[in-house]
Amino acid sequence: MAGNPLSRGLAPTHPGELLRKDVIPALDLPKTEIARRLGISRQTLYDILDEKQPVTPAMALRLGKFFGNGPDFWLNLQRDYDLRTLEPKMAEELAAIEPVAA
């Protein structure tokens, strides 16, 4: 992560932000219909869009099926967001860990 020059300095993107800002506006569907097609409540969809809930493996399967891009895209986006958000918060703890010699 820290070694990836492409990700340095960029704010992590929650999958909900991508859905809210780019994906859903491009669809000609109300959010209620999207939630219905995903088989989830409107509240669950809104919680993801508002970045209050993560994209779980089950949700990634639903999103991947709905958008046709598979679950890995959504899980990878969530994983990257989680790691990039958590790593700075854990910097001291991580610095104190002594790695195993290779």
Give the positions of each predicted feature.
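A short, Lys/Arg-rich alpha-helix, primarily the initiator
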Residues: 5-29, 73
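Short, basic-rich loop-to-helix N-cap that marks the start of a DNA-contacting helix
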Residues: 52-65
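Short, charged recognition helix plus adjacent turn
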Residues: 75-102
